[in-house]
Design a protein with these regions (language model features):
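Periplasmic alpha-helical coiled-coil/stalk elements that build and connect Gram-negative outer-membrane
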Residues: 2, 149-267, 374-377, 381, ...
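Acidic, low-complexity, intrinsically disordered peripheral segments
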Residues: 3-4, 27-39, 51, 235, ...
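A small-residue-enriched
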Residues: 52-121, 233, 261-344, 369
Length: 461
């Protein structure tokens, strides 16, 4: 009797596992007992719960809030450019003569205290105020984009966890089926109905399916811990997290027609951010140009209610409080010189504007292509889902018939194993297609600046 290489290898693994020292097995059992003895808590988490937590704790949203407050403050205080610069001054001086004939007149001491104010009205002030208001409006839109993209990412991750959970369930179901097959085959072998090879094959299938369960569990829990960190949920180690939701939400996705392509570029957050940056750059250029080529007005005022002067030779003293006002107009001339820094600053702003225009044109093409691709993928997934359901129905009936035939002895173990593998594969293919559809729809909604769930007939959890 000859065995295949895979069968011999698997049998060797089984035999090796039986040779593990008993004290190691005892330690593992003790650790498992200690863990199970610890009281476990259970937390049920829905997609809406996860989104709500993420909106409160996500680092990107917090940073965007800080930037929003900053731009709001700068915009609401943009009028402060019209506030004068006010200073309080106090000074003392002493004057002496270099020649003796001027000694009496020039040997004096002066003390003064007063206030001075000055205000420069720049020709670019209006453009500066517009630039600050534009930056605030852009940040408002950016904050909304951050909130929306965070919600979309959290929901996608939630559905990914549901898919990984289905993989765990499939692996456990496979293990249970192989355990049942092994028990049945063992019973038949004891009665002399099947050969020893069938028993060894059933045992190999059972043992090799156990690591698959461990691998699926590890992938699920690692992803779950990353997800909990993302939404800012800290739980004790003894807490079990139960996800409340279903990949069947994919069945509620509406038909999305090609009409969404019309004007889709202007709805894109990426395009809008570039357009906001372009508008801000245009105001910055206007401010730089006005400051470089147009005159500015300067107003000044001084008042010295305390001004004391004393002649140190004659001891004569006098108090002479005074005030003065001034007005001036200045026109920068260096900006008219070729190669000056002022001209280069304006030219650099022009370059920035042209660069943003190129980026916007390119981004619109990219966004349009991306949305068309997603529409195609969504339509394909919806059609594929129908085929997946039919395939699963066929696999379930085929396995049931094969299992009944195996019980009667008209089908061998390999046929039953093949039928079971086909069934589990059909289930996973259905779940994978559902997750793919959900992911594409959520991404499309985000690219069109739509709230998550817009293209669902019911609110997905």
């Amino acid at each position: 009797m000859h065995y295949s290489r895979n069968t011999v290898t698997a049998i060797a693994v089984i035999i090796g596992s039986l040779l593990i020292p008993q004290h190691i097995i005892a330690q593992a059992d003790a650790a498992q007992t200690a863990q199970t003895a610890e009281p476990r808590q259970k937390v049920t988490l829905t997609a809406d719960d996860a989104v709500e937590l993420a909106l409160q704790t996500h680092i990107d949203i917090k940073r965007s809030q800080i930037t929003l407050k900053q731009t709001q403050r700068e915009s609401s205080h943009s009028w402060n450019s019209l506030l004068p610069s006010i200073k309080a001054t106090a000074s003392g001086s002493r004057q002496g003569a270099l020649k003796s004939e001027n000694k009496t007149a020039q040997n004096t001491q002066e003390l003064s205290a007063g206030l001075s104010a000055s205000l420069t009205i720049d020709s670019g002030l209006g453009a500066k105020i517009k630039k600050l208001k534009s930056a605030y409006q852009a940040q408002q839109a950016s904050y909304e984009d951050t909130v929306r993209s965070t919600e979309s990412a959290v929901r996608q991750s939630f559905y990914n966890l549901l898919y990984l959970k289905e993989k765990v369930a499939a692996a456990k179901s496979t293990l249970e089926s192989y355990q049942s097959q092994y028990d049945q085959t063992k019973n038949k072998y004891d009665r002399g109905v099947v050969p020893e090879l069938d028993l060894l094959t059933a045992q190999v299938n059972l043992e090799t399916s156990k690591p698959d369960v461990d691998s699926a569990l590890a992938s699920y829990y690692n992803t779950l811990h990353e997800f909990l960190n993302t939404i800012g949920l800290e739980l004790p180690f003894s807490t079990d997290v139960e996800l409340s939701g279903s990949l069947d939400d994919a069945e509620t996705v509406q038909r999305i027609g090609p009409e969404v392509i019309k004007g889709c570029e202007d709805k894109s957050p990426a395009v809008r951010q570039l357009q906001d940056a372009l508008r801000t750059a245009e105001y910055a250029k206007q401010y730089a140009y006005n400051s470089a080529y147009l005159p500015s007005l300067t107003l000044g005022a001084n008042i010295f209610p305390e001004f004391h002067s004393k002649n140190l030779e004659t001891s004569d003293s006098s108090d002479k409080p005074y005030w003065n006002v001034s007005i001036g107009i200045s026109l920068p001339l260096d900006s008219w010189i070729y190669g000056s820094s002022a001209r280069d600053t304006v030219a650099a702003q022009d370059d920035t504007i042209q660069d943003y225009k190129l980026q916007i044109a390119d981004k619109k093409k990219t966004v349009r292509t991306s949305i068309i691709e997603k529409l195609t993928n969504i339509e394909t997934s919806q059609k594929t889902l129908k085929a997946r359901h039919l395939n699963l129905e066929l696999a379930e009936k085929s396995y049931k018939m094969t299992e009944e035939a195996y019980q009667r002895g008209t089908k061998d173990l390999l046929a039953l194993q093949s039928s079971l593998d086909t069934l589990h594969s059909a289930r996973l293919q259905l779940r994978e297609e559902q997750y793919t559809l959900l992911k594409n729809v959520l991404e499309l909604e985000n690219e069109l600046s739509l709230a998550s769930g817009t293209y669902f007939t019911t609110t997905s959890n």
